[in-house]
């Protein structure tokens, strides 16, 4: 029986049918690696969706940055509206890992800010993987980082049935063991409240509904689901499966074993420091670890508990840590891993382990952490690439590694379903690039189309943005410090024509699906380096390939070897596409793609939550936030997004009571 229900108004076209057939056949023949070489705009995402539907396996789709993850999530939600499409990226808005600089005797404490909505989506992904097979997870490099043992997670989850006998007090203790906190005042995700014989539980993986369990003595009398906003009953259930509030939740037995294991390791390490006559490190480690042990014994958690992950998961020293792959492969289930934009993603995955290990080794050496902290790490590249699953690498410009691993299992996708050609390109003198580009932008904007500009430095991007804004252009600048939510919003705003020109550095290359963009400008194209390599140039030029008027301007004083190779590949592909169009009498037409609903990662709520935590908020600041939210609330209501409008209304009311 098919797991996935793929919805699309169009059948595969162009090179898609042969690519889908070839790669599906390769996967069904149990080949470990395969590669899709697909030009920009050829519908690689749709090909991926068809392959998932035909291979009938849960899938993990990995990308190297959060912007692409958000875009893929949106597209796959549209392709598979009746299946479980999940989102798994880092849950930190801000993260400063703990570190020690010996030469300055400076210890830097871990400092982080967790995004509540991203945490909810991560929990939703792991719970879906443990409960269902029709799951597609869109993930960043976070998929390679350590998680709790999925089998322990299964032990902690609880099935609750109407009519079953349960001691009321032991049920509350079970909720605490599962990571839920009792809170009678602020009832939100990951908490529960108990009034009389009624227990309300707000699952950590769902922000829309909470569960009410009603007892009669020591018997469960009723289970109901309530709307979290309106507080009205939605439905009654005969039973419900309740998952833990944390991916690191463990049972009391495992917790006790972990405490004993940490104590044993501490004793060995203290003995080592004593023998080496390193009393400073001895006392430092003893004090820090014993405090952590007290906290774990009393509450089940401590600050930096991830550093003791090996003790909680039961892994041996240096053994591969549990991660998202283990949730996909639970019950020896077969699954598919698709690495999107593999030419960038794979090198990024390969560099994760070394940096993490370098920092933690210093912490261990100087007594800030036990050696087991080294096992709280991302996967090594060899561990990742040899996972017991099948891989599909997807890129317009795959590296040698992907092609060597895939051998003959490589499919090309050069012909676009729309008949669109690779863009025309032109090299212009960089001496007058700013003024020349300004004139080009005016003609593009007059046609109602958009422009992407890529620069080499942040300073140039800022100055260019300022210059063009002063000259009357609607322009925005996207830089690396902008978070995932805001990046997604900026791209959406560009498509909605809230502005016409987007300037960036290395943010405009892979995977940005912007059919409204007809002009891509590459400043200082002849400056050899990573940002102007053959691969980077081809990827950047491809941003103009979704529009029938697509054009690329490269500003340079000379034609470099990288530029020449990029021109040759682009010209080869364009010639092949033109020939196909001529044979089949196809006229290129710009892609028309509806604006899917963006990720509802409520940045407004996060901002207000932080503001509400402050003891004193100036009246002027409060009024400013209220005004901002009122505007957004009206916009949401106008767009018929009444649920979000009501959320904003409630936040405004809360602010006005301060």
UniProtKB/Swiss-Prot annotation:
GO molecular function: ATP binding; ATP hydrolysis activity; DNA binding; excinuclease ABC activity
Subcellular location: Cytoplasm
Positions of short motif Beta-hairpin: 91-114
Positions contributing to ATP binding: 38-45
PROSITE patterns: HELICASE_ATP_BIND_1, HELICASE_CTER, UVR
Residue ranges constituting the Helicase ATP-binding domain according to the UniProt record: 25-416
One BP annotation, GO: SOS response
Ranges for domain Helicase C-terminal: 433-607
GO cellular component: cytoplasm; excinuclease repair complex
Superkingdom of the organism of origin: Bacteria
Domain called UVR: residue spans: 623-658
Keyword terms: ATP-binding, Cytoplasm, DNA damage, DNA excision, DNA repair, Excision nuclease, Nucleotide-binding, SOS response
Major localization class: cytoplasm
InterPro entries (UniProt xref): Helicase/UvrB_N (IPR006935), Helicase_ATP-bd (IPR014001), Helicase_C-like (IPR001650), P-loop_NTPase (IPR027417), UVR_dom (IPR001943), UVR_dom_sf (IPR036876), UvrB (IPR004807), UvrB_inter (IPR041471)
Family of this protein: Belongs to the UvrB family.
PANTHER family tied to this protein: UVRABC SYSTEM PROTEIN B (PTHR24029:SF0)
Notes concerning its domains: The beta-hairpin motif is involved in DNA binding.
Assembly mode: Forms a heterotetramer with UvrA during the search for lesions. Interacts with UvrC in an incision complex.
Function: The UvrABC repair system catalyzes the recognition and processing of DNA lesions. A damage recognition complex composed of 2 UvrA and 2 UvrB subunits scans DNA for abnormalities. Upon binding of the UvrA(2)B(2) complex to a putative damaged site, the DNA wraps around one UvrB monomer. DNA wrap is dependent on ATP binding by UvrB and probably causes local melting of the DNA helix, facilitating insertion of UvrB beta-hairpin between the DNA strands. Then UvrB probes one DNA strand for the presence of a lesion.
Protein name: UvrABC system protein B
């Amino acid at each position: 029986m098919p797991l996935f229900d793929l919805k699309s108004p169009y059948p595969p076209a162009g090179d898609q049918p042969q690519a889908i057939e070839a790669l599906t056949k390769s996967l069904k023949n149990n080949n470990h690696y395969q590669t899709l070489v697909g030009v920009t705009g050829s519908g690689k995402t749709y090909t991926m969706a068809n392959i998932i539907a035909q291979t009938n396996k849960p899938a993990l789709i990995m990308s190297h940055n959060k912007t692409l993850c958000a875009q893929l999530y949106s597209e796959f939600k549209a392709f598979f509206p009746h299946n479980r499409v999940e989102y798994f990226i880092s849950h930190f808005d801000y993260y400063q890992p703990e570190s020690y600089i010996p030469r300055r005797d400076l210890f830097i404490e871990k400092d982080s800010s967790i995004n509540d909505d991203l945490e909810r989506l991560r929990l939703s992904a792991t719970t879906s993987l443990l409960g269902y097979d029709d799951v597609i997870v869109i993930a960043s490099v976070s998929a390679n980082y350590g998680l709790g043992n999925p089998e322990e997670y299964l032990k902690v989850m609880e099935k609750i049935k109407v009519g079953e006998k349960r001691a009321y007090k032991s049920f509350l203790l079970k909720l605490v063991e599962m990571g839920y906190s009792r809170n009678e005042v602020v009832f939100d995700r990951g908490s529960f409240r108990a009034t009389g014989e009624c227990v309300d539980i707000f699952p950590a993986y769902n922000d829309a509904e909470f569960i009410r369990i009603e007892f009669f003595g020591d018997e469960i009398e009723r289970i109901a689901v309530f709307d979290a906003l309106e507080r009205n009953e939605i439905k009654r259930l005969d039973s419900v499966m309740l998952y833990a509030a944390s991916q690191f939740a463990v049972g009391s037995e495992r917790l006790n074993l972990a405490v004993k294991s940490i104590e044993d390791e501490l004793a060995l390490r203290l003995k080592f420091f004593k023998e080496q006559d390193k009393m400073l490190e001895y006392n430092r480690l003893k004090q820090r670890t014993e405090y952590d042990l007290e906290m774990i014994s009393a509450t089940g958690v401590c600050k930096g508990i991830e550093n003791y992950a090996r003790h909680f998961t039961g892994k041996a020293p240096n053994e591969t840590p549990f991660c998202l792959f283990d949730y996909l492969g639970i019950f020896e289930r077969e699954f598919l891993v698709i690495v999107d934009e593999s030419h960038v993603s794979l090198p990024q995955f390969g560099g994760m382990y070394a940096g993490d290990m370098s920092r933690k080794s210093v912490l261990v050496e100087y007594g800030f952490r036990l050696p087991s902290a080294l096992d709280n790490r991302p996967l090594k590249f060899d561990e990742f690439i040899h996972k017991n699953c099948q891989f599909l690498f997807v890129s317009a410009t795959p590296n040698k590694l992907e092609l060597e691993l895939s051998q003959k299992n490589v499919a090309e996708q050069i012909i676009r379903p729309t008949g669109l050609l690779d863009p025309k390109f032109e090299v212009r003198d960089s001496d007058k690039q700013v003024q020349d580009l300004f004139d080009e932008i005016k003609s593009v904007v007059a046609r109602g189309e958009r422009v992407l500009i890529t620069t080499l430095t942040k300073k140039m991007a800022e100055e260019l943005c300022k210059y063009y804004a002063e000259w009357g252009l609607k322009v925005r600048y996207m830089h690396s410090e902008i978070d995932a939510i805001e990046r997604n919003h900026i791209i959406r705003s560009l498509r909605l024509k809230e502005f016409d020109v987007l300037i960036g550095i290395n943010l405009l290359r892979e995977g940005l699906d912007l059919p409204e963009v007809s002009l891509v400008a590459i400043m200082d194209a002849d400056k050899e380096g990573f940002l102007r390599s053959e691969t980077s140039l081809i990827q950047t030029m491809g941003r103009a390939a979704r529009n029938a008027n697509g054009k690329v301007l490269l500003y340079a004083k000379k034609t470099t070897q990288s530029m020449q190779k990029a021109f040759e590949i682009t010209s080869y592909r364009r010639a092949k596409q033109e020939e196909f169009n001529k044979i089949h009498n196809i006229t290129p037409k710009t892609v028309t793609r509806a604006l899917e609903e963006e990720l509802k990662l409520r940045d407004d709520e996060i901002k207000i939550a932080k503001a509400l935590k402050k003891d004193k908020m100036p009246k002027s600041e409060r009024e400013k936030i209220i005004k901002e939210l009122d505007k957004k609330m009206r916009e949401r209501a106008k767009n018929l997004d009444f649920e979000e409008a009501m959320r904003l209304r409630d936040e405004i009311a809360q602010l006005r009571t301060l």
